[in-house]
Regions:
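Hydrophobic residues embedded in beta-strands of well-ordered beta-sheets
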Residues: 46, 135-137
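Short glycine- and acidic-rich boundary segments immediately preceding or forming the N-terminal edge
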Residues: 1-18
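Eukaryotic short linear interaction motifs
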Residues: 45-46, 103
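Short hydrophobic alpha-helical segments that form membrane-spanning helices or hydrophobic packing faces
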Residues: 47-50, 126-128
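Short acidic-glycine loop/turn motifs at beta-strand connectors
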Residues: 131-133
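A compact, surface-exposed functional segment
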Residues: 50-85
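Aspartyl protease catalytic core from the pepsin/retropepsin fold
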Residues: 16-38, 72-129
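A short acidic Gly-Thr/Ser loop motif
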Residues: 39-44
């Protein structure tokens, strides 16, 4: 599910987006493509908006599952996708969902475009500590 290729203590700030939205949103990269992820410990798994896939490098898997969101229950395929920041790279499992309506609503009201969700399994496996007072995520 999560494989860190080079392990270091990292710190990522979400202060700017938190001031705009009240949500912990961080920017990570897939090669040179910037992706804004909502860090959502209420979500079990990681999700990527299907509209973004045409711009990304990833590996398809044979795995799929039923996902529950505001649109109901949907079957979702799973991909493995490398994401990185200035501290290193990780290959992460993502469920593909059409989250355009939900993410576009946040973009209209708060001015921040979200491309995906990093869920609680990612946070646990990466050893993340979310500090809302400092608006930083540590690993």
């Amino acid at each position: 599910m999560y494989k860190r290729c080079n392990k270091k203590v990292t710190c990522v700030s979400f202060e700017e987006t938190f001031k705009k939205t009240g949500l912990p949103i961080i920017t990570l990269y897939n090669d040179c493509c910037a992706l804004n992820f909502l860090v959502d410990t209420g979500s079990d798994v990681n999700c990527i908006n299907k509209d973004k896939l045409k711009y990304l490098h990833y590996t398809e898997t044979n795995k799929s599952g039923n996902m529950v969101n505001s649109s109901g229950v949907n079957k979702s395929n799973v991909i493995m996708m490398p994401i990185n920041d200035k501290h290193g790279i990780a290959v992460v499992e993502f469920y593909i969902l059409d989250l355009s309506i939900q993410f576009d609503t946040i973009a209209v009201y708060d001015g921040v475009k979200i491309d995906g969700i990093l869920g609680s399994k990612f946070c646990k496996n990466a050893g993340l500590i979310i500090n809302y007072n400092d608006c930083k995520i540590y690993s």
